[in-house]
């Protein structure tokens, strides 16, 4: 998934040039980004979708120092790129770690984790390849109050459940069911850009 580079948005604003984001796969009209749009006020410059995702959940690991290091050093050793990470602490000194990878790595990661079961000492592994990541992108996202709320409102209004959330200075990403990804992009687009 490709989006507008922040610098292109800055240059368009500086020289009063309207931008239009279009798909290279369809002839559908794109999204116009211009001065005075609602998106500008909320620091959002684009919406992106990535369907090449899988969610890995390692369930009931020991909740001890170094557990996350063991998991992610193992992934690094096998050149597995990690995106969103979520750790949740359960009961009885156990925790679960979930993370996203490229869908094409799912089978390989399943094998890596199976081979490392004794070392990692987990109860189970679940890999879901029917997920997608949808992101809003823009400058200063982390310090823009209300942007995440508006994104989540759009998804809730469309009946879309959020599986994982990740934020950074330039984007807010959610992991959702793949079947909802197109509907999610439209709902988020309508929320920030209008019709």
Language-model region placement:
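C-terminal catalytic "cap/lid" subdomain
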Residues: 1-195
